[in-house]
């Protein structure tokens, strides 16, 4: 790289692992990484937090937004519609509490995570919090008799899948609670199984059940899911995380339920079993994005193969330019401890290095003792990992992967990201209504943050799904003269960037705008020094 001219501001971006990012080979890139190099100022990876009892008050939600939460996830495997409606209200109240300052305002998206066609156990002794100890070698009867629905104990376990006796064989395994408890089927009757406890432990109420290898014939969208999705449309959620997606037609079913009123809701398919991994390409095509749901996936396929599935899915999503979320057990130990294990720190960083657009927290924020610390930890790790990306190689490969496209917006996006590397731009400013222009730029993974200015609130909230997009909502009325309206929005982005420390006077930014009103006309690129 040639040295920047002396009249150019000393953009912070020139120091961050830049030496490593521009290496010629991957080995050389690794050799040049430097622990004393500062991290990226703007975090490019989205942080998704599951909201539960530990985090649903407006006060804690405000702190979580300050700490870096971009998307609030509501898990519909638990809780009533009233409970979730209140949580959504609280998330929005917390978000709007920052609305008076357009520079500091951060739109937060709401995601509905469906229960999906899952199998769950009944209540232990009639209580949601009771637990029983299952001893290794003990006999446990699994029954479909509804008399035991709320009377499970260490001898009898009820579950809600009526065809279990048809799909499992003697010698099959039944896993409960993310695989913590494993049962071996010894004999089967018409409506019961006799199993031996292979791996014991304490069993709580309403735990998930996995039947690896069994051809489970549950519908893609259950009756409960239909009610939940309709509730989501009424509540104006921004995205749906669809559980246990096995094929493209499952995604179409979810879309059908969302209907005309929910047509702008993004559908993120959760890949949680062998069939989903096998039919990944058709699912990716039908979806707006993908979640690598490592919890159930790690039971349905061997645990030592999960990383292969993760890398394959992230790679294919990056190639297709669709968002991908890495989830489950990212900072699991922080449910009970204030610091993560070294392995967890590594895991979060490697998910970012693999190319994940977003990283997710589940129990850490929903029920953990340290919800804020977990968000801050993900924020810090993501910034370090982003600085350490092998940007030069990544950009070359992304361009090579899409060289035959004649899409004008794609050409603009590619050109602007290339220019941002050449002039060491501190940010890319994109004016967008539908968000498409910003998504295309994000696809080429610039080092610098993409400040996307929009008047559409939903566009701003959904932009968090894409790596590198920093959405800014313009609340000023549209100016009559198009050129003045463009200047108004670019100035807003400049002010936000300066206030957030992304750049300062004299740095260079790249500005992408349309030369006339109307969606789809982002076709002008300017290289502008920051005033």
Swiss-Prot record:
Gene3D superfamilies: Phosphoenolpyruvate-binding domains, PK beta-barrel domain-like, Pyruvate kinase, C-terminal domain
Chain intervals for the UniProt region annotation (Interaction with POU5F1): 307-531
N6-acetyllysine: modified positions: 62, 89, 166, 266, 270, 305, 322, 475
Residues recorded with modification Phosphoserine: 37, 97, 100, 127
Site (Transition state stabilizer): 270
Essential cofactor(s): Mg(2+); K(+)
Record-listed Phosphothreonine modification sites: 41, 195
Enzyme class per UniProt: transferase
MF (Gene Ontology): ATP binding; magnesium ion binding; mRNA binding; potassium ion binding; protein tyrosine kinase activity; pyruvate kinase activity
Sites where the protein binds Mg(2+): 272, 296
Sorted UniProt keywords: Acetylation, Allosteric enzyme, ATP-binding, Cytoplasm, Glycolysis, Isopeptide bond, Kinase, Magnesium, Metal-binding, Methylation, Nucleotide-binding, Nucleus, Phosphoprotein, Potassium, Pyruvate, S-nitrosylation, Transferase, Translation regulation, Ubl conjugation
Sequence position, cross-link Glycyl lysine isopeptide (Lys-Gly) (interchain with G-Cter in SUMO1): 166
Matching SUPFAM superfamilies: Phosphoenolpyruvate/pyruvate domain (SSF51621), PK beta-barrel domain-like (SSF50800), PK C-terminal domain-like (SSF52935)
Entry binding sites for L-serine: 70, 106, 464
Phosphotyrosine sites (modified residues): 105, 148, 175
Domain of life according to the entry: Eukaryota
Binding site residues for ATP: 75-78, 120, 207
N-acetylserine modification, residue list: 2
Record-level GO cellular component terms: cytoplasm; nucleus; rough endoplasmic reticulum
Residues with PTM N6,N6,N6-trimethyllysine: 3
Binding site for substrate: 73, 270, 295-296, 328
Family: Belongs to the pyruvate kinase family.
Function (record text): Catalyzes the final rate-limiting step of glycolysis by mediating the transfer of a phosphoryl group from phosphoenolpyruvate (PEP) to ADP, generating ATP. The ratio between the highly active tetrameric form and nearly inactive dimeric form determines whether glucose carbons are channeled to biosynthetic processes or used for glycolytic ATP production. The transition between the 2 forms contributes to the control of glycolysis and is important for tumor cell proliferation and survival.
Name this protein carries in UniProt: Pyruvate kinase PKM
Organism: Felis catus (Cat)
């Amino acid at each position: 790289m040639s040295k920047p001219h002396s009249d150019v501001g000393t953009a912070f971006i020139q120091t961050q692992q830049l030496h490593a990012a521009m290496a010629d080979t991957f080995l050389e890139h690794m050799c040049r990484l430097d622990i004393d190099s500062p991290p990226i100022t703007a975090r490019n990876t989205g942080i998704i937090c599951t909201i539960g009892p530990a985090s649903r008050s407006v006060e804690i939600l405000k702190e979580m937004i300050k700490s870096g939460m971009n998307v609030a996830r509501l898990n519909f495997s638990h809780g009533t519609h009233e409970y979730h409606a209140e949580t959504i209200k609280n998330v929005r109240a917390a978000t709007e509490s920052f609305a008076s300052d357009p520079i500091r305002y951060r739109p937060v998206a709401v995601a509905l995570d469906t229960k999906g066609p899952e199998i769950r156990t009944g209540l232990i002794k009639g209580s949601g919090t009771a637990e029983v100890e299952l001893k290794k070698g003990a006999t446990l009867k699994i029954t479909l008799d509804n008399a035991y629905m709320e009377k499970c104990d260490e001898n009898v376990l009820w579950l809600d899948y009526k065809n279990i006796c048809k799909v499992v064989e003697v010698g099959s395994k039944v896993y409960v609670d993310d695989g913590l408890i494993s049962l071996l089927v010894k004999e089967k009757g018409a409506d019961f199984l006799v199993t031996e406890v292979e791996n014991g432990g304490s069993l709580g109420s309403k735990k998930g059940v996995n039947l690896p290898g069994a051809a489970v014939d549950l519908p893609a969208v259950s009756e409960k899911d239909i009610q939940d999705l309709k509730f989501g449309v009424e509540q104006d959620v921004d995205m749906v995380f669809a559980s246990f997606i096995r094929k493209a037609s499952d995604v179409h079913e979810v879309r059908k339920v969302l209907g005309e009123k929910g047509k702008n809701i993004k559908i993120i398919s959760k890949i949680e079993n062998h069939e989903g991994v096998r039919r990944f390409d058709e699912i990716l095509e039908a979806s707006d994005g993908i979640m690598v749901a490592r919890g159930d996936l790690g039971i349905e396929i061997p645990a030592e193969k999960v990383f292969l599935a993760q890398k394959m899915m992230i790679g294919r999503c990056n190639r297709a330019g669709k968002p991908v979320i890495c989830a489950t057990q990212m900072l699991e130990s922080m449910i009970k401890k204030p610091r993560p294990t070294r392995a967890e720190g590594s895991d979060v960083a490697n998910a970012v290095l693999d190319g994940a657009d977003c990283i997710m927290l589940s129990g850490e924020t929903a029920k953990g003792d340290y919800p804020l610390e977990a968000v801050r930890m993900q924020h810090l790790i993501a910034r370090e990992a982003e600085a350490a990306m092998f940007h030069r190689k990544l950009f070359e490969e992304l361009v090579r992967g899409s060289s035959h496209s004649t899409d004008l917006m794609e050409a603009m996006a590619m050109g602007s990201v290339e220019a941002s590397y050449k002039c060491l731009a501190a940010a890319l400013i994109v004016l967008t209504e539908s968000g498409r222009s910003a998504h295309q730029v994000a696809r080429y993974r610039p080092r610098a943050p993409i400040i996307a200015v929009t008047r559409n609130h939903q566009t701003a909230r959904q932009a968090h799904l894409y790596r590198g997009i920093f959405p800014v909502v313009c609340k000023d009325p549209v100016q009559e003269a198009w050129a003045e309206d463009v200047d108004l929005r670019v100035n807003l982005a400049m002010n936000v960037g300066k206030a957030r420390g992304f750049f300062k006077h004299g740095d260079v930014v790249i500005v992408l705008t349309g030369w006339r009103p109307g969606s789809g006309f982002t076709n002008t690129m300017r290289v502008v020094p920051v005033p």
